[in-house]
């Protein structure tokens, strides 16, 4: 098993480490996600939206922990560390448009039968998030994927190693 190290640009020291997954562990995690996705997608849209927004709110409550962590991981000055406003706004917007964006699209050119396009969850959405705005860029794909009934496998940049942990702890 290999170790991933986040080296702080502030002092050149290792700030955080995480073990990589073995191939077996990665396959087990994918299977766990497949199982979880069935139950998740069976929840009503309104419930998925509520749970996603509760998670967003929980991240907001962690802001005092998150900002100094980002400063250490990325070297971003603390005064520029607050991403929660944009994070929350993006998630709220996606929640607000979800019902309309996910509704069936009716195609009517013959009154004798009904045709429509129905959006269905894909399953597992793999998100590779960049380091520069690690929360705001991640929520752009995580929120719509979860709201639509998918589950997410998240891989963050090495330089923002702890962001994924913050997101899974909510």
Report the location of each language-model feature.
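Conserved small-residue-rich beta-alpha loop and adjacent elements
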Residues: 106-168
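N-terminal Rossmann-like NAD(P)+-binding subdomain of aldehyde/semialdehyde dehydrogenases
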Residues: 1-113
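Hydrophobic alpha-helical segments that mediate membrane insertion or helix-helix packing
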Residues: 12, 48, 145-146, 170
């Amino acid at each position: 098993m290999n170790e991933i190290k986040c080296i702080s640009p502030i002092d050149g020291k290792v700030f955080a480490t995480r073990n990589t997954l073995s191939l077996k562990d990665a396959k087990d995690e994918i299977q766990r996600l497949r199982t979880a996705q069935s139950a998740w997608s069976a929840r009503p849209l309104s419930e998925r939206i509520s749970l996603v927004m509760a998670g967003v709110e929980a991240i907001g409550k962690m802001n005092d922990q998150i900002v100094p962590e980002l400063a250490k991981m990325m070297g971003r000055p603390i005064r520029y560390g607050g991403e929660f406003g944009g994070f929350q706004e993006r998630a709220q917007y996606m929640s607000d448009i979800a019902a309309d964006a996910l509704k069936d699209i009716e195609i009517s050119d013959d009154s004798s039968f009904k045709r429509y396009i129905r959006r269905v969850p894909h399953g597992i959405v793999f998100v590779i998030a960049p380091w520069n705005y690690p929360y705001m860029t991640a929520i752009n794909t995580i929120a719509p994927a979860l709201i639509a009934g998918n589950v997410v496998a998240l891989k963050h940049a090495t330089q923002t190693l702890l962001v994924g942990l913050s997101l899974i702890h909510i």
